[in-house]
């Protein structure tokens, strides 16, 4: 079967969604700047620049897209500017993987390389002893300085990285996912049969962008699934992923037995036409693996995995996502949609971690990777789940071996089961560890995990926890663009530049709020102490006095 995708670059309908004032994203002491491409001079890569009170500045990777540019007017029905449309129109219909294998650097590849470097080449470290001492341990990863478009091309060609960019999502700003790059974070949004509207989901999308979501998955399972997805795509500068099985099941009113390959196929094509950048496909849940879950404490906890297991048992047939995998590859190749091969048998409790069912599916994922690559389709692998700290390394080691170093995309993992309401913390611990080991994309967990549908505050708290985890891993790996923010914040802290401390923080508002709870006056922003130690016991203040004394003595 050969399928030609259709580019929907001129849409004939409008969306009845109107952006609120909250759609404008602002950051304190920051401005939007753009970096120009060299291979493709028309490329303008948006970044965030923080201005410090001592005249220094910091350039940051920015996921907010046009929402943080005051010079761009976003008209709600039409959505965002179609950044990639000119590039797509003038080139052959091929995937990023196909171009990469042919040795071709695309505009998307240069764009992603510029983002990764964050203008790092303009900042030189002069303390060589400190650089040697703090040099990261990237384990088996190779992180060049600077990251070049050619390096990105080669990583994609080898299957070690993906650049998710559907031809029908020209609004997206290219980004790269792989263990040799900055660790990325995914945020899940989407309605359920009980809550949420189109407007609320768009608001959640923009809110997730504000707090640093590198990708977003629309996991809607309620009403207006297609309308919500269309609206999100037209308003998203980051790649959007879905689980097509959810919409396919909605078409048969939730009757798993009534679900067919044909219904799923048509759903897949429809979503690819809309512009979805990556699909979670649970093709590794095979008939022979289902009995392996019988003795588990929590059975099959993946929604897609449990649905496909039920379908297999009802029909006494093999998983149609597996038997029709090559046809799925052909559809995805036509639109340059990336695979996110679902971990339908991931462990949902510490008791089930690293069991036979989990790793049996992972081996099948590796086999499916090779088929996808043969068809020129980019692929990453989804992983657990609930894993104690001592078993996390085994997950990463097996994934690299079975899946030939394809990007790993994990949900956490949660390192304990005792923290309902705080699972974002318990899972961020595991996320930081597995990201250091080589995981490329972390799916955030919110405080509402296992309890309910996340609201805006939950989205923020989940993202903050996971941006901390990702950054901690980048520091440990020695990513060349990682440590500068830490150093500048530490310098500001030692020099009592309170405003700079706040503005360099991941969450400036909360940092300022906590400080002002006890010392709200503006004069306190220039004081050489905070309310924790007071003026007499501040270690930094005393340290300055020690330095001054040493200078006089020497």
From Swiss-Prot:
Keyword Iron found: yes
Uppermost EC category: lyase
GO CC field: cytosol
Alphabetical keyword list: 4Fe-4S, Iron, Iron-sulfur, Lyase, Metal-binding, S-adenosyl-L-methionine, Thiamine biosynthesis, Zinc
Enzyme Commission number(s) of this protein: 4.1.99.17
Residues that bind substrate: 188, 217, 246, 282, 302-304, 343-346, 382, 409
Cofactor: [4Fe-4S] cluster
Catalysed conversion reaction: 5-amino-1-(5-phospho-beta-D-ribosyl)imidazole + S-adenosyl-L-methionine = 4-amino-2-methyl-5-(phosphooxymethyl)pyrimidine + CO + 5'-deoxyadenosine + formate + L-methionine + 3 H(+)
Gene Ontology annotations of biological process type: thiamine biosynthetic process; thiamine diphosphate biosynthetic process
A Gene Ontology molecular function term of the record: 4 iron, 4 sulfur cluster binding
Residues binding Zn(2+), per UniProt: 386, 450
Pathway this chain belongs to: Cofactor biosynthesis; thiamine diphosphate biosynthesis
Cofactor note: Binds 1 [4Fe-4S] cluster per subunit. The cluster is coordinated with 3 cysteines and an exchangeable S-adenosyl-L-methionine.
Subunit field text: Homodimer.
Family according to the record: Belongs to the ThiC family.
Descriptive protein name: Phosphomethylpyrimidine synthase
Organism the protein comes from: Coxiella burnetii (strain Dugway 5J108-111)
Lineage: Bacteria, Pseudomonadati, Pseudomonadota, Gammaproteobacteria, Legionellales
């Amino acid at each position: 079967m050969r399928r030609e995708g259709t580019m929907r670059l001129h849409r004939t309908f409008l969306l009845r969604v109107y952006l609120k004032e909250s759609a404008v994203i602002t950051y304190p002491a920051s401005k939007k700047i753009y970096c120009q491409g060299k291979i493709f001079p028309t490329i303008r890569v948006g970044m965030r620049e923080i201005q410090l009170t001592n005249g220094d500045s910091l350039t940051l990777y920015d996921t907010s897209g046009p929402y943080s540019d005051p010079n761009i007017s976003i008209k709600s029905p039409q959505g965002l500017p179609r950044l990639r449309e000119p590039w797509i129109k003038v080139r052959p219909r091929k995937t990023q993987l196909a171009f990469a294998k042919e040795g071709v650097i695309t505009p998307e590849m240069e764009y992603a390389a510029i983002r990764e470097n964050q203008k790092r080449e303009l900042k030189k470290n002069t303390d060589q002893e400190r650089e040697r001492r703090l040099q990261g341990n990237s384990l088996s990863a190779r992180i060049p300085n600077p990251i070049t478009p050619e390096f990105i091309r080669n990583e994609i060609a080898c299957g070690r990285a993906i650049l998710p960019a559907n031809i029908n999502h020209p609004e997206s700003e290219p980004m790269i996912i792989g263990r040799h790059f900055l660790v990325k974070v995914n945020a899940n949004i989407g309605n359920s049969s009980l809550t949420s509207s189109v407007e609320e989901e768009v608001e959640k999308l923009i809110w997730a962008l504000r707090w640093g979501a590198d990708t977003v998955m629309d996991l809607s399972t309620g009403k207006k699934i297609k309308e919500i997805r269309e609206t999100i795509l037209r308003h998203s500068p980051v790649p959007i992923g879905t689980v097509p099985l959810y919409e396919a099941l909605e078409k048969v009113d939730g009757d798993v037995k009534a679900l067919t390959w044909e219904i799923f196929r048509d759903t897949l094509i429809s979503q690819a036409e809309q512009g979805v950048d990556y699909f979670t496909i649970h093709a590794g849940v095979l008939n022979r693996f289902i009995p392996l879950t019988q003795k588990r404490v929590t059975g099959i906890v993946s929604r897609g995995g449990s649905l496909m297991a039920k379908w297999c048992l009802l029909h006494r047939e093999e998983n149609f996502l597996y038997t029709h995998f090559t046809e799925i590859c052909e559809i995805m190749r036509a639109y340059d949609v990336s695979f996110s091969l679902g971990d339908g048998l991931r462990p949902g409790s510490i008791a089930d971690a690293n069991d036979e069912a989990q790793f049996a599916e992972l081996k099948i994922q590796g086999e499916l990777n090779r088929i996808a690559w043969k068809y020129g389709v980019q692929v990453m692998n989804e992983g657990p789940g609930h894993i104690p700290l001592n078993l996390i390394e085994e997950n990463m080691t097996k994934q690299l071996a079975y899946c030939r170093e394809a990007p790993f995309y994990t949900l956490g993992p949660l390192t304990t089961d005792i923290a309902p309401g705080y699972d974002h913390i318990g899972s961020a611990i595991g996320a930081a560890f597995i990201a250091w080991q080589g995981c490329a994309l972390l799916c955030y967990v919110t405080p509402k995990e296992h309890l309910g549908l996340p609201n805006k505050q939950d989205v923020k708290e989940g993202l903050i926890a996971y941006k901390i985890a990702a950054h901690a891993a980048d520091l440990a790996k020695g990513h060349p663009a990682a440590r500068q923010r830490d150093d500048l914040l530490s310098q500001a802290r030692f020099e009592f530049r309170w405003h700079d401390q706040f503005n360099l923080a991941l969450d400036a508002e909360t940092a300022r709020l906590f400080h002002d709870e006890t010392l709200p006056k503006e004069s306190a922003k220039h004081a050489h102490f905070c309310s924790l130690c007071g003026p007499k016991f501040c270690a930094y203040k005393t340290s300055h006095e020690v330095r001054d004394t040493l200078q006089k003595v020497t």
